[in-house]
Regions:
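Conserved, structured core segments of small domains
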Residues: 1-114
Length: 114
């Protein structure tokens, strides 16, 4: 299952940057585990986005854990919006089209901190 995570900064960029090395290290760990397909900052620099692929079984729990364990979330620097996504067309997609949306909680899943 695919998901897009929109990350919105809750603090000034100067403060967010103090945690960015830990955030990047965390993302590299997600990439090594095969969960993170792409990541990058938004323009203007008020947040970022992640393209995630998680197993269908336990998808919501995995997405919640990804959000909750991010140093940005743990320090209150940012909040996540998790959006389940069903890609239909693209260079790296399997030939079969996904016919149904997975049954997850509502699309918005914010950190409960701060």
């Amino acid at each position: 299952m695919y998901a897009i995570a929109l990350i919105r900064y809750r603090r000034p960029l100067e403060e967010v940057l103090t945690v960015s090395d830990a955030h990047r290290a965390y993302l590299l760990g997600l990439k090594e585990r095969g969960l993170l397909l792409a990541s990058g900052p938004l323009n203007p620099r008020n947040g970022g986005a992640l393209l995630l692929r998680v197993p269908e079984e336990g998808a919501q729990e995995t997405l919640d854990r990804i959000r909750d364990e991010d140093p940005y979330t743990k320090t209150g620097m940012a909040q996540y919006e998790l959006l389940p996504w069903v890609p239909n067309l693209g260079a790296e997609l399997p030939q079969t089209r996904v016919a149904r949306l997975p049954s997850l909680r509502p699309a918005v899943s914010y950190a409960s901190c701060c």
